[in-house]
Amino acid sequence: MQLMEYTQLALFLGLLALMSPVLGRFIGRAVLRGEQTWLHSVLGPVERLIYRASGIRPEARQSWRQYAASLCAFSAAGFLMTFGVLMLQDKLPLNPQGFPGLSWHLAFNTAVSFLTNTNWQSYAGESTVSHFSQLVGLAYHNFVSAAAGLAVAVAVMRGLASQESKTIGNFWADLVRSVLYVLLPISLVLAVVLVGQGVVQTMSAGTEVATLEGGHQFIAMGPTASQVAIKMLGTNGGGFFNANAAHPLENPTALSNLLQMLAIFIIPSSLVFTLGEAVSNRRHAWTVWFVMACLFMVGTLSLYKAETLGTPLLTEVAQAPVTNMEGKEVRFGIFGSAMFATVTTDASCGAVNAMHDSLTPLGGLVTLVNMQMGEVIFGGVGSGLYGMVLFILLTVFLAGLMVGRTPDYLGKRIEGREVTLAMLALIIAATPPLLFSAVAAVSGWGQAALNNAGAHGFSEILYAYTSGVQNNGSAFAGLNANSPAWNVTLALAMLIGRFGVMLPMLGVAGSMASRKARPIGEFSFPVSGFTFGLLLTLVIVIVGALTYLPALALGPVVEHFQMLDGLLH
């Protein structure tokens, strides 16, 4: 690596470390505790109006079961609305291109995808979805799916911080505050900045331009900047254009690239410090943050190294070392593409500024492992935090078993119920990618979708279902997934991955809230410092990533050795 690459990585992490504690404290005040902030003078009346119009009583607290029921009811209503909008878009306004309604299976897949914060796209946005569908059906979910994840994370924090309580907050109040005080203001500012960088924002269908060859080309446009801002900030990832953040009208400059990466990580990173504030343990927050940052750096440097080594066949033909620039934008280069790919697969975002299908086998392996570790390396908005709490509980439990102490976390005893729910969430998240991948690999509909045979074809299948279950949404684009079987199975994978982890973690929150914290003494396992950080890292890697080792051996690992031997499919 050159000095410039080290500088970019240091600048990114430095800005993240400076901004995250500030935003984390703000989220603690505005969402976790519902206190007055400097935004309340403007948005407070809007919040109260929403409560009155919706019949919400923000002071009414809910048990974890009531909280979960509200979450599921809200999600079901949002799914039905978006499904209807997509099916009927040819009869709705703001459709200057005259796009027809989507097929039932594509509408089902897309509605589930945006509902679950996955944003998997089996279609090209600029040639399939109308402006109305983008703004009302999809951009709406970019806000509320992220807000739902943030609300669940806040509920988990309350469960850890409360003592002898039967409630964990109010889902509706948490949802409204998350949108009004966190997502909406930041995305508004970011959208304006992105417009200044050259991201388009118009209601026009597009424009026709003369090319250098003397011909004419129609360039699709639309309300892009507003959707890009929230798709990054909410770790959604679904692009306005099919090329996503590689498109010059969606991510035109190196500065816009940096801002979009910061937007992806900023809320998940900040929530770590909100947790520290909630439980009055900032050292614990910094330890968890450094674990995330170290895993992120390892992923970025590994991916960068794999791409700079290139492929032996091209090196042999060129008679000189050739880096792998296939599928990458020259304006970002290998390091800018590698860091973005690591950010987006760490954070369950799924936006891409380079084609992951064109990565080297080891480069693709890094992106797969990032997701398979549970999307806890900062992770999605909310989901990264409560996913990390899951691994923290397992770490504390295992540490207690090793030293013969009763495991406790923040003064509260970890009992069989919490461990059972945590393991249930892990098993639920790990099973669908392996099961669906196995079925697709031996089925006619699965093989028919492949453009590549052999190990890389299997990697495409495994990547798709891993991305779906982990609510990431990125893809190895050589897979033609727009068919009834693919759309339905991927939608099921997304639903299982989203609610199969959310609901058990709400159960953990309810169980922990009912306990009384004991004074933390010398016999309590410390949840800060090097020892805890190392043990947490090992648990994430062993429990999270090694679950998939046999499948990875059949995909990118085999493909890497075939590449070294000069084998092609």
Swiss-Prot record:
Which InterPro entries does this UniProt record tie to the protein? Answer: KdpA
Q: What is its main location?
A: membrane
Q: How does the entry describe its membrane topology?
A: Multi-pass membrane protein
Q: Tell me the superkingdom of the source.
A: Bacteria
Q: Which GO terms describe its molecular function?
A: P-type potassium transmembrane transporter activity; potassium ion binding
**Keyword line:** Cell inner membrane, Cell membrane, Ion transport, Membrane, Potassium, Potassium transport, Transmembrane, Transmembrane helix, Transport
One Pfam family from the record: KdpA
User: Where located?
Assistant: Cell inner membrane
Instruction: List all membrane-crossing ranges.
Output: 3-23, 68-88, 136-156, 179-199, 259-279, 284-304, 384-404, 422-442, 490-510, 534-554
Q: List the disulfide bonds.
A: none
Q: Which GO terms describe its cellular component?
A: plasma membrane
The record's similarity note reads:
Belongs to the KdpA family.
Its job: Part of the high-affinity ATP-driven potassium transport (or Kdp) system, which catalyzes the hydrolysis of ATP coupled with the electrogenic transport of potassium into the cytoplasm. This subunit binds the periplasmic potassium ions and delivers the ions to the membrane domain of KdpB through an intramembrane tunnel.
User: How is the quaternary structure described?
Assistant: The system is composed of three essential subunits: KdpA, KdpB and KdpC.
Name of the protein: Potassium-transporting ATPase potassium-binding subunit
The species this protein belongs to is Nitratidesulfovibrio vulgaris (strain DP4)
State the organism's lineage. Answer: Bacteria, Pseudomonadati, Thermodesulfobacteriota, Desulfovibrionia, Desulfovibrionales
Q: Which gene encodes it?
A: kdpA
